[in-house]
Amino acid sequence: MRILGIDPGLQTTGFGVIDVDGHRLAYVASGTIRTTGIALGDLPGRLKLLFDGISEVASRYQPDTSAVEIVFVNVNPQSTLLLGQARGAALTALVNAGLPVAEYTALQMKKAMTGHGRAAKSQIQEMVRRLLQLPGLPGTDAADALGLAITHAHAGAAMSKMAEVTQLQRRQHAVYKGGRVY
């Protein structure tokens, strides 16, 4: 399975693509989409650049699913609104590409990657480097995106296991209650 992770931002959006085969993780690609070349006041232009960039990444790497960071509420409401709009452009591009979208908070990703939710960016970079056996540290935005993809790979495996257990429990319950297996 191929997973595309997205760390949305209005100036810099990180992306990371990994392949998952059972418990094996393999690095495919990562990078950033920068909107700094567009004037700060041209919000629609920046959002279009993000949409087009994520659409291009999805088209090039053909992921099966995606994972996106959930926006946190910032002290500055204007910053939160702008980040939310960037996230909206990312979500729209992913859905437009026909991808399922899973959402994780930064805290969930950090906890999944390092064991605690208050990890520094450098710790995320190092764990991504180790888990994907990269020769060097990825940039912070790309590392966060790869971390989201890895988090989704682990969460997806856990969710599949839970679904199997739930199905087994339903079957046992059906046998016990009704005498039949459905």
Swiss-Prot record:
Known EC number: 3.1.21.10
Positions with a binding annotation for Mg(2+) 2: 69
Keywords: Cytoplasm, DNA damage, DNA recombination, DNA repair, DNA-binding, Endonuclease, Hydrolase, Magnesium, Metal-binding, Nuclease
GO biological-process terms attached to the record: DNA recombination; DNA repair
Main subcellular location: cytoplasm
Top-level enzyme category: hydrolase
Family of the protein in this entry: Belongs to the RuvC family.
Protein name per its UniProtKB record: Crossover junction endodeoxyribonuclease RuvC
Gene that encodes the chain: ruvC
